[in-house]
Amino acid sequence: MMKTAVMFILVVVISLTYSSEEQEVARTYCGRHLANILAYVCFGVEKRGGAQYAPYWQETYLRSRKGPGVVDECCFRPCKLEVLKSYCGV
């Protein structure tokens, strides 16, 4: 009986962990927060302000895309990190 209860709890915990990883929450990112999250997603840095990361925000460092831009996709409506990653340079 005890083994069955432990096994049941283990299955529930694993399934909850797996499902939470699959369901990333879409969020809105605007202004400085959008710049900071792009720096983190694309370059693995936390932008502290100032000019030390300014070259990263030049157009040559971001992938050019046709259609809506990152502000349209992630500020005006919620987006997931995968959308933000699609704007990183290759």
From Swiss-Prot:
Single GO biological process annotation from the record: insulin-like growth factor receptor signaling pathway
SS bond list: C30-C75, C42-C88, C74-C79
One Pfam family here: Insulin
Protein name per the record: Bombyxin B-5
Function: Brain peptide responsible for activation of prothoracic glands to produce ecdysone in insects.
Propeptide stretch(es), residue numbers: 49-64
Assembly notes: Heterodimer of a B chain and an A chain linked by two disulfide bonds.
N-terminal signal peptide: 1-20
Regions that span the bilayer: none
Keywords: Cleavage on pair of basic residues, Disulfide bond, Hormone, Secreted, Signal
Family, as annotated: Belongs to the insulin family.
Keyword check for Glycosyltransferase: no
Subcellular location, record wording: Secreted
One Gene Ontology term, aspect cellular component: extracellular space
Key word Signal present: yes
Further facts: Silk worm has two kinds of PTTH: 4K-PTTH and 22K-PTTH; there are many forms of 4K-PTTH.
Primary location recorded for the protein, binned into one broad class: secreted
SUPFAM superfamilies documented for this protein: Insulin-like
GO molecular function: growth factor activity; hormone activity; insulin-like growth factor receptor binding
